[in-house]
C-alpha cells in the first residue's frame, strides 16, 4: 500500500474513533497579547491563540481566583479588547476543539494582562547616574508618596518585582521606595526603564508608569574630545559654542550637562583637520549654561533617540565651563584645555 494512502486511512480511523490527541503536550496552545500584556487603562489589546494543529473552535477565558469566565468562543483564534477596564486585569488561557472530536485540547500557557494607570505614577531615578560605564554598577530607585505594597521595574517586556520596600519622611510627607541594583552592566542593560506601583490585593492593577529613564552604557569606542571657542577671553552675553571632535566618523553626537541630556543631538559631523566635528550651540554665556559638559558619539545601528536608549556611547574628557557674573568691573573667562583631563575655566578681573 502506498505511504500516502496509509496516512489518509490512519487519519480517518483517528477521527472516527475520536482518539486524536487531546489534553496532551503535543497540541498545547500558546496565548499572546499584542502589542503588549501591559495595557494602559482605556487602551486596546488583542489576545491570540496559536497552535500548529488545525482547530475549528477556539475559546479564550479569564481566570479570577478559582472561577473562570469565558471571554470568547468561535471560529476566530483571537479577540480584541477595547477599551480596557480594571475588570480585564487577570490571567487568561485558551483551548481548542477538533471539528469531529468531542474533547478539547490541553490548556494554553497562562497569560497575565496588566492594566496600568489606576493610580498616580511614581518617580524613577538612577544613582549615581544614568550614564553608566560598561562593567560598572547602577541603582534604579522607584519612589512614591502612595503606600504601595510593591514596585515593578520594566523595560521592553522585561519585568522585575521589588523584593523589599523602604519607608521614610520627606518634608513632612510619607513615602515608600524600592531600589533595583544592576551590574556589572553590559550593552544589554541599555534602554528606557519605567516603574509602576501596585497593592497586594490587586497585583494586576498597576499605577500609571513613571516617566522613562534612559540608561546609557558608555565606553565601547575611543572617546572624542570636547572644547570651546579658540579665543580664550569670553565675556558674559557672548555666544557659547562647544565642539565635539573624534577620529571616528560617528553617525550622531550627543551633549550632556551634569550627566543629563542637554536636549541636543546632531547627525554626523563635518570633516575638520583630520577629525570629525559636531558643533553645539548652548546659547549666550550667562551663569545659567555654566557647568560640566560631556559629549558622546554613537552609530545608527544603536541609535540614541529619546525616550528609547539602546546605544553604547564613548565618553570624552570633561569640559567644565565656569561663567562669572559682574557688571562693574567686567569679568573675562579664560579657558585652559587639558588633554584627557577636566578642562579648566578661570575667571579673571578685566584690568581696563
Curated annotation (Swiss-Prot):
Residues 17-112, 224-311 form the Ig-like C2-type domain. Glycans are attached at residue 78. Residues 1-16 form the signal peptide. Its main location: secreted. The keyword Signal applies. The keyword Signal applies. Keywords: Disulfide bond, Glycoprotein, Immunoglobulin domain, Repeat, Secreted, Signal. GO terms for biological process: cell surface receptor signaling pathway; immune response-regulating signaling pathway. Disulfide bonds join 49-94, 244-295. This is Putative killer cell immunoglobulin-like receptor-like protein KIR3DX1. It comes from Homo sapiens.
